[in-house]
Amino acid sequence: MDLVALIPTMETSKSVKDIADFFKKLPSVGSKSAYRMAYAALSLPKSDLIAFEEVLNQAIQKVHRCLKCGLLIDDEECPICDDMTRDRKTVLVVTDSKDVYSIESTDAYHGLYFVLRGSLSPANHRTPSSIGLDALMKKVKEEGIQEVIAVTNKDLEGETTALYIANLLKNSSCKVTKPAQGLPSGAIIEYADPLTMSEAIKGRVLVGKENE
């Protein structure tokens, strides 16, 4: 019998519940998975848990968003923004820092990045200003950006975000492109294989002109 399956209907340790509640805040983690993770964590040696606490505390103190691009970094200097060999007139926009590392692994792109705080979602109270689109527009204007590549997830929220960016810049000299159709509908950027992502970026098309 799966004891974890009984958790919602039986009383459990408050400490376990508190830990599970935190795990449930992670993406794609439901109640059962959260309780499994909580019990698994508490099954580790105490020394491992203490070490994890120290690592987490260090991350809380050190990790911050780059003021220029929004990437989560440890140091004061951003390895992307401060690299003067990169194309400084092209900005690739993603909705999560982990997407930057996925794209960097393809070696298909050598420009700058801008990390939004998620995709547009009125239902989840994610507005243009709250996800950072105002800051993106400011960057485009002040730095003379010539191309914005919208690499958002291929779901409704991601596509809506890409179209919104294109609409904001439709009367400017900056073009807005997106990866070619190699990425299937519903695709999540971090799960795309490097070759597919590389080809999609190299073959990028203007937003709104995908089927022409």
Where are these regions (language model features)?
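N-terminal amphipathic/basic-hydrophobic helices that include classical n-h-c signal peptides
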Residues: 1-9
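Catalytic cores of large soluble enzymes that bind and process phosphate-bearing ligands
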Residues: 11, 44, 48, 124-128, ...
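Cys/His-rich Zn2+-binding cysteine-cluster or related metal-binding knuckle/ribbon modules and their
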Residues: 11-17, 25, 35-100, 206
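Solvent-exposed alpha-helical segments within well-ordered globular domains of core cellular machineries
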Residues: 17, 21, 35-39, 50, ...
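Long C-terminal interaction/binding lobes of large macromolecular proteins
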Residues: 18, 110, 137-212
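Conserved, well-folded catalytic cores of nucleic-acid-processing
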Residues: 22, 26, 44, 59, ...
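Extended interfacial segments that mediate partner engagement and assembly in macromolecular machines
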Residues: 34, 83-152
